[in-house]
Regions:
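Motif-centric detector for short Cys/His coordination patterns
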Residues: 1-88
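Active-site environment of non-heme Fe oxygenases that use a 2-His-1-carboxylate facial triad
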Residues: 51-53, 57-104, 109-323
Length: 323
């Protein structure tokens, strides 16, 4: 039962009201309406869940486990074995819970053949296609159309912030990592946002309320993509919904002159906190690891690596959270 509304609710007048009402023996509320010769029955649990009083709304508790650099001491808590996901629904649920509540999970002991991550990813759903192809190859190439395809260090960032709807999840499958350098970093941007909300509210409010432009120019497609979005977006309950942030692709500031200075300072502060050691964890991906995370919560980066000292090859995949 989809519970989709089949009748035209717009034909119900704005002045409709209960004609008679009573509580039945099973606890349900019975209402006879003033028009339409219709009687409704409401379960008390449904009424409580949909009660819109301020007192009821204050009961909301965030499901997210916010974390900082202290997670470095317990990286095993975000690890799960590849075969556990493949062979059991319990393993799949554990993986999904890590992704949803903590925003990060490292799948261990996956095969290291090209495209082999698709099997475990399909335990969740199908991947999302982009112009980077699936999978996209994270390797050092001579003429890259993205900074990821170089040996340079990458500051903590989300992928594709210039998309209208950036991918919800990202998966980086390590095939080879023998080069010197190339260690990974991650930061819970929800935790950084929460720090600002509790300690620097003026900056937090600017990041929530001021849309800025993100832009990408891709020579391989002769295309320019851009979109406006706030660095922090919230749910109706005031919880964290999305982070949209990448220093590399944040375009020239485009806001009212009266707030330009404060907007610049707010983004400067946010960017610095997203790289602060007190919020960041660091680790090295080993062949067979799949670094999986909420792309609209967790920012990721890497240190510079020496392509002459060995090889580094990751395959990347995207997936929408709706899936």
């Amino acid at each position: 039962d989809s519970r989709h509304r089949m009748f035209n609710i717009l034909k119900v007048s704005e002045d409709i009201n209960p004609k008679n009402y009573s509580v039945k023996e099973d606890g349900k509320l019975e209402i006879e309406w003033s028009e339409g010769d219709h009687t409704s029955y409401y379960d008390p649990n449904w009424l409580r869940e949909n009660c819109y009083t301020i007192k009821n709304k204050q009961k909301y508790v965030s499901p997210y486990n916010l974390w900082d650099s202290s997670l470095q001491k317990n990286l095993k808590s975000i690890q799960i074995d590849h075969d556990e996901i493949i062979n059991s629904d319990e393993g799949l649920v554990k993986w999904l819970e890590l992704l949803h509540y903590t925003g990060i999970a490292i799948v261990k002991n996956a095969p290291i053949e090209k495209n082999s991550a698709l099997k475990v990813l399909n335990r969740i759903s199908h991947t999302r296609e982009t112009f980077f192809n699936t999978p996209f190859e994270v390797i050092n190439i001579p003429k890259p159309n993205n900074s990821a395809y170089t040996a340079h260090a990458l500051r903590n960032h989300m992928d594709l912030p210039w998309f209208e709807n950036p991918p919800g999840y990202q998966f980086l499958h390590c095939l080879i990592n023998s080069a010197k350098g190339g260690d990974s970093s991650a930061v819970d941007a929800f935790a950084v946002a929460d720090y600002l909300r509790n300690n620097e509210k003026d900056i937090f409010d600017i990041l929530v309320n001021t849309p800025l432009k993100f832009r990408d120019k891709d020579y391989t497609q002769e295309a320019v993509r851009s979109v406006y979005g706030t660095a922090i977006s919230l749910t109706k309950d005031g919880d964290y919904n999305d982070i949209r942030y990448s220093i590399a692709t944040l375009d020239a500031l485009d806001c009212h002159p009266d707030i330009m200075d404060s907007v610049y300072k707010a983004h400067h502060r946010f960017g610095n906190l997203l790289h602060d050691a007190k919020f960041q964890i660091n680790f090295r991906l080993e062949p067979g690891d799949i670094f999986s995370f909420n792309n609209r919560r967790l920012l990721h980066g890497r240190t510079e690596f020496d392509p002459n000292s060995g090889h580094r090859h990751l395959q990347g995949y995207y997936m929408d959270r709706d899936e």
